[in-house]
């Protein structure tokens, strides 16, 4: 079974747009349900930078006069998909991140989002000092001019979109410190089960009688025991023209594959070539240990001459004895020749081997064979084998490195082009 993160990665950008739907139901508290399948265009009255009129409204701080001044929250397709992917990556653990955007009239516009390094459990997420340091560094280096932090988001894996007591307290502190501020909650498990994104946007209110009476009409079972402390905003989605053209384009890049049959075959060939090099080097080491390097063709010739001097008296003695035996047995030999005029092949070979000239020929043949096959010939042949094995090894290695480099380039391009 695929994990939620793996299932999300298989979707194209156009298919991910279909996930930007609200959950169905009549008790939507004024939620919008825009169609994102292309038959009905998205609401696109917004841009990625605030207007001058919006900046004037921010300076007036009208939300301080009306606790429920903000009634709408607009999320860009980019921010929404990044939030959803972060929640999917977290799995059963809660995740947390920050929202970037601006204020337009009574609507908080969320243009982008980014993750925070936090400690999360199944029911709680804690931001440590490292998270605040990361937030400051991110604002100084990666946030475009005109955008600011307009809220935070976290996930509720499997138990709906609402604010707990700790969530409401955190939102109240942030609203008092850096208002306008928005809290977004997303449920990745329900989003995957229903096929539409389950998300909610909330703001807290001062604890007054009027707000308590208004919030008492909400469903406490849905929004929790602290539903009187906050209210929900309408959520809509928008796309900037650049995002729409990119989603409608026919750009298609397949994710790079980590390994295939070709790579496995090349790895096997590389191991075989390495073993061949090792075996040739081992044979060279054994041969040098058995035959000293000082033995060469001249040393072999001297050794053969010494053997020849020791063998010659013995060979002459054997020939003289054969001559004496032939003089006493000549009659018997003549009789045998009359019976069998043709000598046998064995007798001819025996006479040839017993002759002194044959002895000299054999000695010369043994000396010449020793001269033609010195120890250096084996070294040269083993050196040729080693060079061939090393050449094959380095060729396969370079081809494999080239293949991995191309795979890295594809992975880098895919990450730069499609990472949200």
Swiss-Prot record:
Highest taxon listed in the record's lineage: Eukaryota
GO biological process, one term: cellular response to pheromone
Uppermost EC category: hydrolase
Annotated Zn(2+) binding sites: 154, 156, 167
Occurrences of domain MPN (ranges): 73-208
Molecular-function annotations in GO: deNEDDylase activity; metal ion binding; metalloendopeptidase activity; metallopeptidase activity
Subcellular location field: Cytoplasm; Nucleus
Similarity-based family: Belongs to the peptidase M67A family. CSN5 subfamily.
Record function comment: Catalytic component of the COP9 signalosome (CSN) complex that acts as an regulator of the ubiquitin (Ubl) conjugation pathway by mediating the deneddylation of the cullin subunit of SCF-type E3 ubiquitin-protein ligase complexes. The CSN complex is involved in the regulation of the mating pheromone response.
Protein name: COP9 signalosome complex subunit 5
Organism for this UniProt entry: Eremothecium gossypii (strain ATCC 10895 / CBS 109.51 / FGSC 9923 / NRRL Y-1056) (Yeast)
Name of the coding gene: RRI1
